[in-house]
Amino acid sequence: HDHSFDDMVTDDPYPMYEHWFVCAVRKDYQDYPENFPEDYNPYPQPTHRCTIEGSDLQPMVTSKDVLHGLPEPEDAFDLSQQIYSKAKYLGNGSQGQTEVRLDYVAPTIRSEHHGNIEFRRLSAEHGGTHIEELAMGMQERRLTPRECALIQTFPPDYQFVMKNGNSRGFLLSSSSAYKIIGNAVPPVLAYHIARRLEEVWSLYFGA
């Protein structure tokens, strides 16, 4: 088989970084996708504008669309919003040293913890651009597990950080939550890919 890849998540209703999906295509379709029958296309049709244009497409989903209305950790009741990585800003250009662009798609949600989780906002000293939030006294901090999960399209009530009964420990810590969220295939994305494959399954493999 020749392998071709096509879909980028930024043109669908998800506020996240680009994903690439690889699909095996028969060798007689050497000029895929130009002459590949549209009915056989394994990918959902784009619905939002980001890397492509179209009057029938909706505006891209931004980080602000997803994170709007969430309380700051100190005001939250949700443990997944209260607890977050306290790794300090390094400013050396390495992973996890930039803040979320609220007017664009979100950065990569990594399956790691200390120092690799991007900042929800940086201080003015570190080049932060969310001036209104800083003026309101909001502090420099990294994304919470809840914010990462919303970017990855998990439901807002899906629990990640959980207490271990009456003890001071956790059944699942924030560090483990970051790893689970970062490793996950975004649920809404997986749903739409699966539904499209369901539609074309009989074309590929017969009834």
Model-flagged regions — what are they?
Residues 61-207:
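C-terminal target-recognition/interaction regions appended to catalytic cores
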Residues 1-102:
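Class I S-adenosyl-L-methionine
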